[in-house]
From Swiss-Prot:
PANTHER family on file: SERINE--TRNA LIGASE, SERYL-TRNA SYNTHETASE
Pathway stated in the Swiss-Prot or TrEMBL entry: Aminoacyl-tRNA biosynthesis; selenocysteinyl-tRNA(Sec) biosynthesis; L-seryl-tRNA(Sec) from L-serine and tRNA(Sec): step 1/1
Protein name: Serine--tRNA ligase
Record function comment: Catalyzes the attachment of serine to tRNA(Ser). Is also able to aminoacylate tRNA(Sec) with serine, to form the misacylated tRNA L-seryl-tRNA(Sec), which will be further converted into selenocysteinyl-tRNA(Sec).
Compartment list: Cytoplasm
Highest taxon listed in the record's lineage: Bacteria
Protein source organism: Streptococcus uberis (strain ATCC BAA-854 / 0140J)
Main location, first listed in the record: cytoplasm
Any one GO molecular-function label of the UniProt entry: transferase activity
Keywords associated with the record: Aminoacyl-tRNA synthetase, ATP-binding, Cytoplasm, Ligase, Nucleotide-binding, Protein biosynthesis
GO cellular component term of the entry, any: cytoplasm
Binding locations of ATP: 261-263, 348-351
Residues the record lists as binding L-serine: 230-232, 284, 384
Length: 425
């Protein structure tokens, strides 16, 4: 959530930055008008309360002197009624302010490229060279079925579209991947966490999913629970409402969890395969950092995600997302896209973001600065390290062989009992 004081004191800058994210100045002007009205009413309310206190003292004195205080009592009753009316108007304005400010996205960092959509993202670097095949390659969904390791037909029967069963060495490959990812992040100083897979509405608000993106989630009916769309939500909210010791920062968390997404608005996109599912595993990284260190931590987090792809020897590229393509809470985001041979393109496999104090303000996560003793909002960061199903897709396609088999990447073999190949039965 943006700082209302910042909007008030630096309106033009905030308006200019949000315009690059598609926010009209009209909504900001309305917010500014409401804020000004609110401040005027607060002044009026305080003045009336001060007058009422004086009147109350005068009435008490008149009664002690056995003087008639009926006029003063009537005036005080009118003041009380006026205060009540102002308080009611303030509550109404506060509600309107909340409605606007809670759906405004974060302001982009100065280094973020300005653009409308994914076409305006800027490629930063590439790693690895896409393999040249001398045979007709298969898509990962065909490989999965031919190798008897992925079953979409029964997934659709048991649940519905965009669900599947992993089986045999497919299940083991998935498990090997997330164990490998967690182990790699642990080496980099991340604390491993097993989170709840349901959170309450306050947690969804804290990380910015609620109220704006409610339609993208799976809520449990007649409850305060939501299935997590990412482990970012429980990990970030771990410290919601707390004050941390500055000397303990940065704090790094990692967790593997299922992620549940309704994929509202994705009809017709990636209807086959592992790219877009309602339920998938993802290894998440979350950091809590001091403001002056958060962009250095973003580079480290991105490197941690890249490390996984490099050790798996999967070609990828890194993009700096433009203002029009960034997520709601992000101030800056790097996307990692892995090479998918059957689609002859790179597809997103990780997104690493610095939200600055946007989530911390919503979730009230603060730290005590050891330098001056003051309590301040910290910065939160989050990143995929990696989306496991998409990594399975990338391995199946990049490591496929002419005979229909798939070679298991060397770093995963210790996690798969030494198996080197997934072969057709």
């Amino acid at each position: 959530m943006l700082d209302l004081k910042r909007i008030r004191t630096d309106f033009e800058t905030v308006a200019q930055k949000l315009a690059t994210r598609g926010v009209s100045e009209d909504s900001l002007n309305h917010l500014k008008e409401l804020d000004e009205k609110r401040r005027q009413l607060l002044v009026s309310s305080e003045e009336l309360k001060a007058e009422r206190n004086l009147s109350s003292a005068a009435i008490a004195q008149a009664k002690r002197n056995k003087e008639d205080a009926s006029q003063q009592i009537a005036e005080m009753q009118k003041m009380s009624a006026d205060i009540k009316a102002i308080d009611a108007e303030l509550a109404e304005i506060d509600e309107k302010v909340t409605e606007i400010i809670t759906v405004l996205p974060n302001t982009p960092h100065d280094s973020v490229p300005v653009g409308a959509d994914e076409d305006d993202n800027v490629e930063i670097r590439r790693w690895g060279t896409p393999r040249e095949f001398d045979f007709e390659i298969k898509a990962h969904w065909d490989l999965g079925e031919d190798l008897d390791i992925l079953d979409w037909e029964r997934g659709a029967k048991v649940t519905g579209a965009r669900f599947l069963f992993y089986k045999n060495l497919g299940a083991r490959l998935e498990r090997a991947l997330y164990n490998f990812m967690l182990d790699e992040h642990a080496k980099e100083g991340y604390q491993e966490i097993i989170t709840p897979y349901m959170v309450n509405h306050d947690s969804m608000f804290g990380t910015g999913q609620y109220p704006k993106f409610k339609e993208d989630t799976f809520e449990l009916k007649d409850s305060n629970f939501v299935l997590i769309p990412t482990a970012e939500v429980p990990l970030t909210n771990y410290y919601r409402g707390e004050i941390l010791d500055g000397k303990d920062l940065p704090i790094n968390f990692t967790a593997m969890s299922p992620s549940f997404r309704s994929e509202a608005g994705s009809a017709g996109r990636d209807t086959r395969g592992l790219i877009r599912l309602h339920q998938f595993h993802k290894v998440e990284m979350v950091k809590f950092a001091k403001p002056e260190e958060s962009y250095e931590e973003l580079e480290k987090m991105t490197a941690n995600a890249e490390n996984i792809l490099q050790k798996l020897n999967l070609p990828y590229r890194v993009l700096a997302l433009c203002t029009g393509d960034m997520g709601f809470s992000a101030a800056k985001t790097y996307d990692l896209e892995v090479w998918i041979p059957a689609q002859n393109t790179y597809r997103e496999i990780s997104s690493c973001s610095n939200t600055e104090d946007f989530q911390a303000r919503r979730a009230q996560i603060r730290y005590r600065d050891e330098a001056d003793g003051k309590v301040k909002l910290l910065h939160t960061l989050n990143g995929s390290g990696l989306a496991v199903g998409r990594t399975v897709a990338a391995i199946l396609e990049n490591y496929q062989n002419e005979d229909g088999s798939v070679t298991i990447p060397e770093v995963l073999r210790p996690y798969m009992g030494g198996a080197e190949m997934i072969s057709p039965k």
